[in-house]
């Protein structure tokens, strides 16, 4: 168990949260949610002991082991991958090191023997005999193959390094598990595995995530950071969202009725207060008026962008036709003989390795050329492309208004500013350099650029990356209303499943040859499809 007592934190005059009394109990998974900048990650750091609060304290149950998903993979550069995972259980790793050091001594004394016996007992109590196999299982489940377990962490790519740190946090069944964005750099199947792992986890989990499907699957409670408080709700994210929206509408409706009643009473009092025959009634109405109080509806720190894709030109019947497409990268065939067509209004998800799906979307956009094959877009197509890597677009000192002007025929500042405003850029924010934007800000700028183009076909590669829950919800709602055609690649299961009715997988045959699978089904159905699981060597989820 972990709890807080009168926990407060502020930086200068800015209060993130104050007097937070909250208890997180075993057997529950708590989704820590809130707008960007509300203090979610900072609250998590307070719980982990990495951030000193302004006042109050964090209380951890006696003998409880707390594990945190760390971000400092450079600290393990010179460590073997499997060993880095074992280091997640500090006490066990310390016992293992001392035990190995004693057994490695050339002159083994009686004192060494006594100490070794103590360590063997502690090693057994900590399930040390199964430690390496458990660590290896975690790594394999997170898509790090066995042959890489003995490599130094510095030899892994950045995505693998992050997954090693996740395995490290999960290792050894900690009593309290703190996870900040654990699904980052995970493929869809690793995310689904993590969902099942946390669903079955018996101890306390507190997690920050922008993945709604993930939060819905793993969370028994939601802890909402808003209004400088941390408020606990039972239920998963969707239940919290629906109930909080309902409660807000009810308070707003109640206030509207009260405001109407106030107007009615004021009008009566003003009209008849000087009328002798009506003075008693006017006095009664005045008394009623004084008793009516409006609910104090505080403005939330949450802000939702306004995402809508207007299509100025209607699509014809022919949207896209391609055949025989092939792409090779560093001598590896990503895909070959890829051919399919897309109809007006059709919404398609691309599945497969990230490298392959990004390569195909880049080819479809015209940004790169295929090694073989051809593709043809319909004459009425106005294409909008969202690349996964948007950094090249922001390698400039232009401010945001001038950055947007590059993509607009209408150069008037008010026109360009209106699109930035839709994506929550206002005032002086529009004057800052495009080169200093955060990942989420860059994505919002790219979406503003897309809206400016009035596309009737969208190619989206990882559009929810770096976005907060509010922006993802706004984008999702905007795409649900989009009448054009769509091809999307994303690890956000709920986002994709809500949009598509067809999945094109850049997969492979049993003997490893690239093959396209064109499947008319929802994304959830695709993920559970037994044939897909068999192709990728995955066990069917219970």
Where are these regions (language model features)?
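A structural signal for long alpha-helical coiled-coils and helix-turn connectors
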Residues: 103, 241, 270-273, 277, ...
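Short amphipathic coiled-coil heptad-repeat segments
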Residues: 136-142, 267-271, 287-292
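ABC ATP-binding cassette signature C-motif
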Residues: 1-253, 308-542
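Proline-centered turn/helix-capping motifs that create local helix->coil transitions or kinks
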Residues: 130, 277-281, 291-301
């Amino acid at each position: 168990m972990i709890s807080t007592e009168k926990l407060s934190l502020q930086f200068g005059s800015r209060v993130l949260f104050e007097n937070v009394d909250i208890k997180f109990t075993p057997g529950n998974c708590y989704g820590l949610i809130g707008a960007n900048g509300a203090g979610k990650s900072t609250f998590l750091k307070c719980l982990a002991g990495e951030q000193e609060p302004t006042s109050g304290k964090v209380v951890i149950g006696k003998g409880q082991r707390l594990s945190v998903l760390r971000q400092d993979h450079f600290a393990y550069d010179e460590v073997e991958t499997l060993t880095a995972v074992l280091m997640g259980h500090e006490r066990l790793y310390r016992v293992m090191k001392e035990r190995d050091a004693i057994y490695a001594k050339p002159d083994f004394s009686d004192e060494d023997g006594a100490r070794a016996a103590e360590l063997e007992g502690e090693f057994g109590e900590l399930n040390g005999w199964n430690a390496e196999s458990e660590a290896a299982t975690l790594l394999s489940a997170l898509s790090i193959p066995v042959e890489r377990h003995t490599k130094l962490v510095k030899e892994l790519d950045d995505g693998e390094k992050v997954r090693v740190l996740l395995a490290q946090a999960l290792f050894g069944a900690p009593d309290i598990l703190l996870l900040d964005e654990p699904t980052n750099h995970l493929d869809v199947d690793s995310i689904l595995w993590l969902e099942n792992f946390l669903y079955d986890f018996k101890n306390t989990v507190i997690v920050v995530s922008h993945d709604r499907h993930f939060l819905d699957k793993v969370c028994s409670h939601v802890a909402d950071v808003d209004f400088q408080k941390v408020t606990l709700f039972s239920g998963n994210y969707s239940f919290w969202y629906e109930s909080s929206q309902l409660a807000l509408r009810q308070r707003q409706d109640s206030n509207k009725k009260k405001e109407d009643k106030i107007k009615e009473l004021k009008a009566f009092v003003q009209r008849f207060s000087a009328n002798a025959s009506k003075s008693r009634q006017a006095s009664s109405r005045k008394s009623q008026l004084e008793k009516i109080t409006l609910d104090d509806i505080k403005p939330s720190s949450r802000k939702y962008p306004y995402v809508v894709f207007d299509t100025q030109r209607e699509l014809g019947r022919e949207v896209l036709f391609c055949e025989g497409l092939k792409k090779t990268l560093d001598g590896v065939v990503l895909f070959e003989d890829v051919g399919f067509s897309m109809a007006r209004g059709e919404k398609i998800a691309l599945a497969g390795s990230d490298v392959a799906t990004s390569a195909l979307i880049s080819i479809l956009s015209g940004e790169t050329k295929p090694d073989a094959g051809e593709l043809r877009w319909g004459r009425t197509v106005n294409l909008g492309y969202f690349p996964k890597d948007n950094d090249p677009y922001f390698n400039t000192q232009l401010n945001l208004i001038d950055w947007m002007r590059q993509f607009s025929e209408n150069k008037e500042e008010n026109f360009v500013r209106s699109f930035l405003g839709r994506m929550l850029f206002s005032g002086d924010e529009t004057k800052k350099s495009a080169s200093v934007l955060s990942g989420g800000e860059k994505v919002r700028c790219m979406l503003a650029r897309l809206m400016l183009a009035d596309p009737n076909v969208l190619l989206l590669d990882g559009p929810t990356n770096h976005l907060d829950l509010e922006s993802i919800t706004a984008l999702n709602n905007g795409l649900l209303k989009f009448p054009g055609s769509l091809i999307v690649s994303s690890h956000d299961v709920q986002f994709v499943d809500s949009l598509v009715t067809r999945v094109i997988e850049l997969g492979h045959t049993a003997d490893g040859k690239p093959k396209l699978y064109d499947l008319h089904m929802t994304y959830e159905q695709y993920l559970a499809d037994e044939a897909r699981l068999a192709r990728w060597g995955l066990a069917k989820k219970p």
